[in-house]
Structures are given as C-alpha cells and as structure tokens.
Amino acid sequence: MATLIPVNGGHPAASGQSSNVEATYEDMFKEITRKLYGEETGNGLHTLGTPVAQVATSGPTAVPEGEQRSFTNLQQLDRSAAPSIEYESSAAGASGNNVATTQANVIQQQQQQQQQAESGNSVVVTASSGATVVPAPSVAAVGGFKSEDHLSTAFGLAALMQNGFAAGQAGLLKAGEQQQRWAQDGSGLVAAAAAEPQLVQWTSGGKLQSYAHVNQQQQQQQQPHQSTPKSKKHRQEHAAELIYASPSTSANAAQNLAQSTPTSAPSNSSGGSTSSSGGGGGRKKAAQAAAAAAAANGVHIQKRYACTHCPYSTDRRDLYTRHENIHKDEKPFQCYACLKQFNRADHVKKHFLRMHRELQYDINKTRRHVSAGSGSSGSGSSGSGSHHSGGRGNVTINSAGVNIDNAFLEAQRHPTSSSMSIVETIEAVASATDMPLAQLKQEKMDDGAGVVLPLHVGVMQQPVASSSSGSSGSHGGNGNGGSGSGLLKPKREKRFTCCYCPWSGADKWGLKRHLNTHTKPFVCLLCDYKAARSERLATHVLKVHNKRACSKCSYLADTQEEYQAHMSDVHGNVGNANGGGGAVTIYTTTTNEGVAGGGGGGGGGISGNISGGGPLQEIIVNPSSMVGWRLSANGSLIPPHDLLTGGLPNAATQKRGSERLFQYLEAEGSDPEDYARLLKMDAISRNTASVAQDFHKAGGVHELKIPANHQLLFNNKLPSQWTTREAAALLYSLSNMGGGSASSVSGSQRQKFGMRARQHSTGEDDENTPSSASSSSFSGDEFNMSATSPLKLSRHAIKLEKMDEMDAKDMGPTKAMMATAFLEAANYEQTAIELLASKRKIKVENDNDEDQENQQHQPHQQHHSQQQQQQRLQLIKSSPAYKLNNNNNNNSNNNNYYKDKTSHRNAVHHHRQDDKENNKTKSPGTAAVSVAAAAATSPPSISGPSNQTPFLTQMEYQNLNRIGTQFQNYVKDIINKYYAAETPLMLAAAAAALPTATTTGQQQQPELDIENLSPSKRRRLLSETEEYIEYLRNKEDITLTIAPKVQPPAPVTSLLKRQLDLSTPRRSPKKAAPAHSNSASNASRKSLNQLATLLPLLADAASQQEYLAAPLDFSKKSSSRKQAQPKKIRLTPEAVVTLLRDKYLNRMVRQRLGCLKCNQLRKNSSISFNYHTLGSLALHKYWRHGRLGSSSTRREKLQAALQKRISRGQADKC
C-alpha cells in the first residue's frame, strides 16, 4: 500500500523535514494506512491539496528538493527494480476516481476524529490551506480535510491495533507537544547529528500502557537544511533513538538512560513497536539486531508489557494477555468432551487433538464461564486491580445502554439441573437489542453499574452426562449441545507405529506414551512391580505397601493422618516463608482448597502471592526445601547425585528402598500441561540409568561392598573393567614375583597409594578412571596423595622412611628396607623401558654356532643385567582381592625379570640359575634391597605380628575370592590348544596366576627342572614375552574380562603383589602390531601374531561360560533399557522374499505338496508354485487342469481369439 504524507511545498523552511516519530513508526503506519484507506488506485491514494506521486518510466530516482518523502516513494526507492517517481506540484491533475476516493477517505477520517474527541482526546491539530504545519492548541473546525489529521488518526489507530479499543486521555501522545516539536524541527534537523535518545516510559495506568516522554531535555539546535537520505539504512542512521522503559524501571535508571546517547543503536530499537516490511521474519531480525546493538552499547531495552508476578515481558499484547492466565486463580478454558480445565486455549486444543481424535474440535466451546451473579460481584469487588489479573480485555456494558432482561440474568444465577450456567455471547446480546456490534465493542464507560461480559465469547458446554437431554432453549437450536458435537472427525494418516506390537498412532506423543506399556519405566523399589504410568505406581505403593509419599521431601507416612500432620507441620508455611537476599521464590499453581501460597524474596528475589490449593506444585523451589535436590538454571529440579559416573559409592550415605520412592511419584497437580512437573518427572523417572542403579542398590542384585580405604587398590575398577594395560601390569608383576605373601600393612599401603598418585599426576589413567565425584576420599594425610607430583611423592616417601626408622627397633629391619625400596621405585620405570629397548635389539639366531656363542656370552650378560636390576626394587602392589595359586610359589629370591624367564606350558615357577653366584657379587645396598624382597616373598610367619594381620580381610573380598580351579583349567586348555609346546613364560605365568581358590602357604608343588632348555630357546621365549608386553602397552581397545564363578568363600592367608608402574608415557617408538598370520598350530615357534590373540580368546571364553556377572558399570552414560531395534537383514531382495515366503507358508501348507503337472512343465515355465494345502491344490487342479482344458488347450483358444480381434481391426481400417 502506498500513501502520501502532506507536503509543505510552499514553505522552504518547512520542506524536507524529517520527523523522528515518522522515521520510527513508518513501517507500522504502512499497515495502519492500508486498513484505513483500503486498496490503492493507479496513481496512489492522496489527500486534497497534496502532491501526487506518479509512477513513470524515467525520471529522477531521488526525492526532489523541497519535497517531503512519502510511503510510496520510500517503498519505491527501497526496491532496486522499481521505476522512478515523478512529482506534481498540485493535485489538479488527479483523476475523478482519486478525488472521489479521497472524499470518502476524508469522511471516514472525520468520523474517526469525532470518536477520538468523544473518548477524551482534547487536542486537535489544524493547518492552513497551504499545508503549513502550525500548532493549534484549540479546536478549529474547518470544513476541508486537515493535513495533520492523517498523523493524529494514525496515532489513534495505532493504539487501537495494539490494544484492541480506542485510547483515552492517557492513551495518546499529546499532539500539541508533538506538533510543536515538529515545528521546531522545520529547519531540516538531522537526527543522527544532534538528536538525543528519547526515553519513552510505558505506564501501567490501564489496559493501554500509554507512553510519555521522560526526557526533559528537549533543546534542539538549528542546523542547515539537509535532504533526507533515500535509503532505509541511512534513514535509520539519521533517525532519533527511542528507548522504552517498563513501569518497574527505577527513576535513576530512567535518568541514566535519558542522559546516555549511544550513536550506534538503530532507530528501530523500540522492540516490537517497529516492524519490517518483510513480515514476521523481518520483524524478528530487526528486533534481534536492535537488541544486539543496544546491548553492545550498554543500553538495556525494556519490553512494553511486563508481568508483575514473574520476570516475563513482551512487546506483544496478545502474548502478554495469554501469559496473564497463568497467574489467575480460575481456569477459563475447558475441554467440552471431558470437562477438564485449562488456563490456556492452546492447551485445550492440544489436549483435544490427543485424547478426543474422534470428535470435531470447536474453539467456541472451549470457553468456560462462571455464573453471571458471581462473575459480576467478583469483578465489581476487584476494581482496578483486576486489570492485571483479568487476563482478557473485558468490556463494561452500561445497563442503560444495553437492555438485558432481568429474567435472563436471574436464570443464569440459578441454573437448572439440565444445563449449567450458560452466558449468551456478545453477538447475541447485540442482535437482541439492535445495537451495532462494532459500536458495542468499542464503547467504554468509566463509571456506572453494569454487567461485565468477556470480550472473547463462547458458550459453556453441557456436561457429558446430561448430553442426552439435548440443547436447552437458550441455545436456540444452534447446535452447541453435547449431542451436536459428536461428529466424527476424519482420521488422519497414522505415521507412528510401535516396534513391539501392531499399534499405530497419529503423533509422536502417543507413541511415547504407548511405548511405556512395553518398557514400564516406573519401578517399585519395594517389590518387583513395574508400571507404565507414574500414577499407577503411586496407586500400587498406596494399596499394596500402604505408604503415602510426600511430594516435597523423602518422608513416607504409614497413615493418612501422619501424612496430613507432616504436611501441616513441615510444609504448612512453606508458601509464606520470606526469603532473604537472593532467595528463590516459590510459585504455586492449581486452586481447589483456598490455601494461600506465595513467597517473598528480599533483594533480588521476586515476590509472588498467588492463591493456591491442594498439594502445592512447586515450579521453582528453594533448594533448602528438598534435601539433596539441586535447582538448574532453567528452573527444573535435578534429583540428588546418584554417582552415575562409575566407581563403587559408599553405601552408608545412600538411601535405600522406600526412602527413594518419592523420586518416582508424580506430583498431584491436575494440569497435564504443567511443564515444570514434566521437567521434574523427566529428570527423575526418565533417567533410566538412575532407575537401574536404584533398583540395583535396593536389593535387586547383590552388590559388592568394598571399604573406602581399599578402593584405590583396584584402581576403582573390578577385574571385568580392566584394560590391556592394566592386565599387562598384572602379568608383569606375576612374572616378577612367583610367590608372595602379605607384608606389613603400612608398607603395602604406602606403595599402593604412591603408585596411584603417580598415575594421577601423569594423567595416563584418566581414560579408565571414574570421575572425581565418585572417587574415594581419605581423611588421613597419609592417603591424600591422589593429585601429587612425583617430586612430592618422593618427599613423602622420605618422610615415611624417617617415620619407619623410629619404629625399626620394634618392627625389625624389614620395614626399613621396604621404605628404601619404595623410595628407589620412583625411578624404576625409565630403567625398565631402557631395558626393553635394549632387549629388542637382540636378534634371535637359530644357528648352532650362534647358539654356542650366545652360551659363552650369556653369563656376562646376565651378570650385567642383574647389576642394573638389583639396584632398584620393583614397586609391588597388592593383588585385586584374589590370590595366586601357591603351587606355583618358590622360596628363592626372584628379582631379575629379563634373564631367568624360562617356561614349559605347565611350568609356572621362577627359577634362578645363578643365585649363588649373583648373591656373592652383590653390593651392600643391593643386598639390603634383596633381603627386603626376600622377606616380601617368604611365607608368612605365625609369630610375626605384621604377618598375622592380612591387608584385606575375608569379609571385604568375599565376592572376589570365590574362584576355583575350573576357570584356571579352562584357560590352560586354551593355552594348550593354541600354544602346544612353547608358550612363553609370561603367558604361562599369567595363566597359572589367574584367580584360583585360596590355598595355604605350606602347599607347594615340587619345582620342575628347566635347566635343560637351551640358551637359544630361553632367549627366544624372553624376546617373545617382551614383545607381547610391548603389544599390551600399545593396545588400548581390548578389555580383559575376568568373570569368576561363584564359589564358597575361603579363608585369606596370603596375597599377591602386583605393580602398576606403566602409566608414564613411553619414550621408545611404538611398534606396530603385525598382521595376523595363519601359521600351522604345530609350528616350532609361535609368532607374536598368535600371542596377540590370547587375550581376546580369554575374554571371549570368560563371557561364554557365564561366570559371576560383574557389577553394574555406572560410568557408562547410556541407558540400560534401549528400545529394540529391528534386525538388519543383509540379503538380496530375492532371498528375503524367499525367506518370508517359506516362513509364513510353511506354517499352513505341507511340504512337497505340489501339482504334478506343474512340476513336469517347470522347464518351460520359470515360475512355479509348489506350496499348497489340500484345498488350494484341489482348486488349482480344477481351474488349471480341470474340465476347462489343459493349459495348452486354453493357450490355443486365446491365440485364436487374439487372431480374430487382429483381423477385425485390419478389416475396419480397410
């Protein structure tokens, strides 16, 4: 639509003026003038005495000097493809149609002007015939059209569009002040150069939140005339800035905003008042750009409509009015099918389309009304305070203006039994009194007793129970009765189907609701009951277990009296509590019993005092009201931390059974659209991992109990959670220490926590270590070493060494030697890596000459390696709650790992060939270390006080010590199968050291003499073992699963030592794993490729045997109840068709029951069907080979008929 604004052509001083308000409200005026003037004509609509913009094919593209811009030329200039515009000096050339249309528009504008004058607009602006803008404080009636009437009418119509009715005295900006300011700007003031931002405050005087200028500094400087820029971008830069402040804005903030003059904020920073010509998307982008620009300059833009009950604010009145219903006491909408009440109309529609698909939805029946008497009395008593809480723009109709029958009102105050209180619509009242509907809606009386009727009309639907009685007489046969609403709705396409059953639904919400009937996510923690609905679970708990759960805390009452006493005592005044500082406000919803609820927040808190009833549903809860619960940023409730990130939490701090039941009970609010409740239930009940863990802790699965001070012994993991790196460390320690027993408690604990601290400091164990939330903490300073560096660890070891020296007289020299070994173990890993690198350089030679040469040099090499190895004692950690088979133990000191590893497949003992020789050459320091190691590997002494106390008791590891010899034999069978004769010692030791039943220290097996092995074979086994260790170092994706079978617990007498000194990053280059080779099983030498397959075989074998299931691993965030996915069939379509045919036809037909004649003709026909029942076979023979003739006879008949048709066609053509 294009419309002109009056131009002051005869006055150069006033020509080309740029109004700030015009530039700001230009887009809004387009819509206003389109509704005011209607459709445009060929040359555009214009008023009398104003120039007309004509569209021409050529001419200047900019606005000529002395002319003022209009909506037409601005719209044309913004479009690159639009033609140029020419201007006429007068309106004499206008056509007769334009004049007639203009006169009609003048009459319409005058009527609108009169309505505004009657409604309280005391200022009317007039102008002379020359179209000069002159402020006129008094009313001067002029017969012709006033050039300023367009702008004043636009202001009134703008208020009418924004608020739904005409504005009063406070509703419009004073036209005199505005025109006076325009007159001062007549010299061509440029807005971007000298205009200050105008702070427009929207007051809360009524439904129309009128705006008034707060900026008192209206001094404007006179500057030379400049033409208005032709592009919208430049117009925004030259336009003045309007800043809107809500009523809640303080005076200081308003003054600061008025004094601040940011230059980069665009002119459309008024939020929702200005709208782009591109539609809704353009308006959103403009508002976002304005908000971003204002935020960048430190200007906070307030929305026009701000809720006094919550922080909600908006620029749209319809959204604000809809939001008001949330805080209202009553629910003005209801479902006319089931009479369920709602506070928003869109909620009714959503409910209706979900639950009553077979009925026809009618929005006119969703409005719920109370009786006229109670409604009028309530509205009258509320007074002006009902403006904010009413929610809908109510029109007060004076009783003198509308003659409503008193009998009709009396009938509504006393409804009959067949119909509830039915209020006639405004349209019906208007038609009955012969009053125009438009005038009835726009009429607004300030005082006088009247009847308040809602502007949004509707008819109360009768109850379903009385629908059979038909509509009452007041309906007048308009079909609004319950029986008339039962029209069947055409069924929509069902696009959502269940994967478990043939169910199908129309929306995703119904599918999710239906899937709960299969998954049953609501689990009773007191028994094995599972429910698909939370309310069914609550009913089950009440009826079966006779418990009543509080929805606000973890209290469970046995009787209703105890529950009510608890609610009154504990939660009785929770709504009236006043919070201090930034306390969180408690908002309540639903009203049934009249219980007052609310809360005040001092400082930054927001107060709210809303009438509530029944069990108060908390939307935003103070965290102190629910112990252990947390409040998220969006207001939803987060359940207590359940330690879902792994580890074994301390059971003493976990609630069990019925105390956790309240987490799964649904709140008792009747509103299904209570989004806070849905968020709460989603955070509690839908958390499947939490449900699985709570069920596990409530007694569903036997849980392993490990003391807090012993959890680091396992790396916070069970054997089923070990990676190959940890498994390699276990094999490494088992091969080093063939036999072991429990040492002193303090020494093993120091070594254990020292190694764990080093792993935390290097960060290598983070991939399999649970989060810090689930890790155990220790009160003593001796154990708080989980984040220390190796330097601090060494200092701590020195401190422990000094402490041990003080007790050396009582404890003996063993403890001091272990402390020294612990101190030297910090530098062990680097040396071990160097040894591995040096050993990899040794090539295996199979020639006899090289073997003899190696035999000559071997004593020297062994001696050199022993000197390096004996200087450091390997760090020993206690084994993970199971014991090495003591049949594999020996009493010799086995500190050398690389030189004395020789093995047979059944030989799992460590033997030193040159023990005596090496012991003679030891230095004093090395001898002390060796004595310490020998003491660690010796059998326990009954008289020794340190050996009498085991590190771990029987009760602590009762579930991990139930391991018998069955699994050990099974693993040995696998090793014998794949490694017949020459299994390396590392693997043999690992197989023998796998968890077995506990044996006494005196049970020992006679040692096997393995000295007869040649040095070349011994060196070869050593090389293979080192390569396998390195492979385990580099391999991260294989997990060793050791799932022991349940065995009766056995007494604990000795423990193995294991080391975990493999966490430091390797400095040697990684060796790529070689490809798998299919070598024969009877080969003399087993390659590394075969060795690498042992670990996956062990894991697979353990999983197939179904030994003791590992406890739940809560470090995995994935849900334990996943929806069943359809199986993927990787077959060709023909094969799939064949499988489906065989699957379903085989159920009802007999195999090999086919037609003999068809089988004989199979060679000629590519398609044959051999699956028949007795009935189908009889029918087939009758129709196929019966009296109608054989297939050949019918074929001949068909061919003859075809030939006849062809001949007839040819004859017709001829």
From Swiss-Prot:
Record localization: Nucleus
Keyword Zinc belongs to the record: yes
Xref: SMART domains: ZnF_C2H2
Record-linked SUPFAM superfamilies: beta-beta-alpha zinc fingers
Keyword set, alphabetical order: Activator, DNA-binding, Metal-binding, Nucleus, Repeat, Transcription, Transcription regulation, Zinc, Zinc-finger
Annotated coiled-coil segments of the chain: none
Compositionally biased region (Gly residues): 473-485
Function in brief: Probable transcription factor involved in the development of the adult pattern of macrochaetae. Required for accumulation of achaete (ac) and scute (sc) in proneural clusters. Probably acts by binding to the proneural cluster-specific enhancers of the ac/sc complex and increasing enhancer efficiency, thereby acting as a stimulator of ac/sc expression in proneural clusters. Also required for correct development of the embryonic/larval peripheral nervous system (PNS).
Organism for this UniProt entry: Drosophila melanogaster
Induction: Up-regulated by ac/sc in proneural clusters of the wing disk.
Superkingdom, natural source: Eukaryota
Expressed in which tissues: Expressed in the PNS and CNS. In early blastoderm stages, it is ubiquitously expressed, then, before stage 5, it disappears from the poles of the embryo and faint stripes are visible. At stage 5, it also accumulates in the dorsal region, cephalic furrow ectodermal patches between the tracheal pits, where neurons of the PNS appear. In older embryos (stage 15) a strong expression is mostly restricted to the central nervous system (CNS) and PNS. In PNS, the pattern suggests that expression occur in many of the neurons of the ventral, lateral and dorsal clusters of neurons.
ZnF locations on chain (C2H2-type): 305-327, 333-356, 496-518, 522-545
Matching InterPro entries: Zinc_finger, Znf_C2H2_sf, Znf_C2H2_type
Gene Ontology molecular function, alphabetical: DNA-binding transcription factor activity, RNA polymerase II-specific; DNA-binding transcription repressor activity, RNA polymerase II-specific; sequence-specific DNA binding; zinc ion binding
Main location: nucleus
Region (Disordered): 1-20, 213-238, 250-284, 367-397, 463-488, 741-790, 848-946, 1062-1084
Compositional bias annotation for Low complexity: 258-276, 855-871, 885-896, 923-946, 1071-1084
Protein name per Swiss-Prot or TrEMBL: Protein charlatan
Any one Gene Ontology BP term: positive regulation of transcription by RNA polymerase II
